[in-house]
Each structure stands twice: as C-alpha cells, then as structure tokens.
Amino acid sequence: MSVVNRRIAVYPGTFDPITNGHIDLVSRAAPLFESVVVGVAQSPSKGPSLPLQQRVTLAREALCQHENVQVIGFDTLLAHFVRHVGAGVLLRGLRAVSDFEYEFQMASMNRHLIPEVETLFLTPAEQHSFISSSLVREIARLGGDVSGFAPAAVVAALRQNL
C-alpha cells in the first residue's frame, strides 16, 4: 500500500473541453483540500476533439484563480497517476442518476486497484447539472452558441478545431 495524503484530491477527466460544470466542481472542491490536481487524461479510445496539451492549457486558464489547483496531463492508468501524485481522494462529479451506474462501477474498480484511495462524489450546482463536454462539442459542431456553458477561450478553441 502506498502512502497517500487525504488532503490531496485528484479530479480526473478527459475535459474535452472543460466546461462551466467542471469549473464549478473544482471551485467548490478547492477549499476542502490542501491541493486539487485536475488530471487531464489522454483518453485515445474516446477520440478527443482537442489535443491533450490544448486541453491542459484551457483547463489551466480556466482554473488559474485557485492557488491550490494544478492541472496535469497524463497518459497512464488513473490508479498509477493517483499514486504518482500521492493523492488520497479521487473526486468525481455526479450530474444525474444516469451518471451513477457508470461512476459506481468505476469507483468499485478503483477501490480494487487503489484501496488506499477514497472516491468522493460531488453534485454540480443546479445551473450546471445538464452540461456535459459531449453536448458542448455537439452544439459547437453544429454552429450553436456554447458561451453559456464554457469559458471564452474554450469557445474559441472549439470554433477553431471543429
């Protein structure tokens, strides 16, 4: 078993792109922990629309007001990344009941792989509960206005890349 720090949380995701819902979750988690590491996953199987480094940059820009938040890209197994940063908490967002089954399965697998790490679920603020990266991408791809769902830099990146 690795030494973990329960004051360090990892919030993993593809963040393709980072949305106002993600930002809200990090903003509410930041005061609860000494450090929040936003782990931006390479996730080649998901076929991200934005390259990893651009997703990391956009997340850093969106979260720069939080001194205890760092954004790191990774291309390893999540369990290895969590151990690498020494985190004792894995943060996940639950928007709706539809998220629960998948998140419960992932939490169970992570408990098997990294039993020393606890998974903590946070629900979004109501105004962000319907936002997902895939919906934001689809709306942007079809020429819709996503400025209410993501930071301006993300909106510009989507216009350029989709």
Curated annotation (Swiss-Prot):
Record: residues binding ATP: 14-15, 22, 93-95, 103, 128-134
Native source species: Xylella fastidiosa (strain Temecula1 / ATCC 700964)
This protein's pathway: Cofactor biosynthesis; coenzyme A biosynthesis; CoA from (R)-pantothenate: step 4/5
UniProt name for this protein: Phosphopantetheine adenylyltransferase
GO CC entries: cytoplasm
Keyword Nucleotidyltransferase appears in the UniProt entry: yes
Cofactor dependency: Mg(2+)
Gene that specifies this protein: coaD
HAMAP family: PPAT_bact
